[in-house]
Amino acid sequence: MKGNSTLNICKMSLLAMSLGLIGCHANQGATQEKNDRKEHLSSDQNLTSFPNTDSSAENSIQTQKLDQSFQVNTVASFNEPWAMAILSDGRMLVTEKAGALKLFDPVSKKKLSVEGIPKVAYGGQGGLGDGTLHPNFNNNAWLYLSYAEAGKSNQFGAVVIRAKLDLTQPNQPKLIEQKRIWEQVPKVEGQGHYAHRLIFDEQAKLWIAPGERQKFDPAQDMKSNLGKVLRLNDDGIPAQNNPFIQQGGVAAQIWSLGHRNPLGIAFDPKNQLWVAEMGPQGGDELNLITKA
C-alpha cells in the first residue's frame, strides 16, 4: 500500500470486513514473487494453458441492477489502516501500518493515539498488522497485536504481543504489561506475505495465520511456522489436541499447512474456520480449514 488511504467505517458489518480483506499486495512483492516463481519451476514441468474467453460471450452476459439496501457514511479517516477491533462500548481500535494504534469514538468523533506501541518494521507489506481482543477483554483488558520486526542481516519476521489496554486516563490510552507470545520462524529476507491474521474461537484459543513470506517451501516445512494456520492458547503455548503436538517445537503450533498469504480469517455460525488467501495475479482462494 502506497501513501495514505482513507478507511470508510460503515454502519453495516460487511463480510469483507469480517474476513479482514483490507490487506494490500505491494507491487515490489508481486514482482519479486513472479521472479521467484520462474526460478522455482523446473524445465520439465508442464504448464496447462487455457483459451481466452471469447469477447462475444462476455458481451452476452445478462446483468441485473439491484436496489441498494444500505448507506455508506464516512465517519473518520486513517493513514494506511490495516485492522479494526470494536470494544463493547462501541469505540474502535484501528491499526495503522506505519506503527500507530488509534482509539476512535464514533459518537464523539474523538480519535486518540494509543501509547506504548512497539517499534515496527514499516515497508513493503510490513508494519503494524492485526489486532484482536481477548474474549474476556472486559475483565482482563488483553489486546493482541501482530506486527513486522527487523532481525539481523536484513531479515524480517512477524511477531504477536499481548498487552493490557489501559483506559484509566480518558485522554491517553496506553498499552501496559506487554508480553511477546509468538514469532515467525525463521526470519527471512523481503517484506512480503506476513499475513499474521489473528482470531479467537469460542474456547478462547488464539488462531494465527502467518504467510509463507513469498518463499514457497516453508509452507510445507514442519520446522517453520510460515504458511500455516496455527492454534495456540491465549498465552502463546501450543494448544492441546493440535495434530502435531507430540512433535514439539514449532510443529506443535500447527493446525493446517500449505498456505500462501492468508489475509482473511473468520468463524462462521457453525464455528467452522474460513481463510481467504491472496493468489498471484488472480487465483484468490476461500478455504475451509480442517485439522491436518
Residue ranges and their predicted role:
Residues 21-23:
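C-terminal motif of bacterial Sec signal peptides marking the signal peptidase cleavage site
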Residues 98, 156-157, 219, 223-227, ...:
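A detector of repeated loop/turn-to-beta-strand junctions in beta-rich toroidal repeat architectures
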Residues 186, 191-193, 241-264:
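Short, surface-exposed recognition loops and adjoining beta-strand edges that mediate ligand/DNA contacts
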Residues 25-216, 272-279:
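Acidic, Gly/Ser/Thr-rich repeat motifs that build Ca2+-stabilized beta-propeller blades
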Residues 106, 163-173, 230-240, 289-292:
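Short loop/turn segments immediately following beta-strands, especially the blade-tip
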Residues 14-19:
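Hydrophobic helical h-region of N-terminal Sec-dependent signal peptides
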Residues 250-290:
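Repeat-solenoid scaffold signature
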Residues 2-13:
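Bacterial N-terminal signal peptides that target proteins for export
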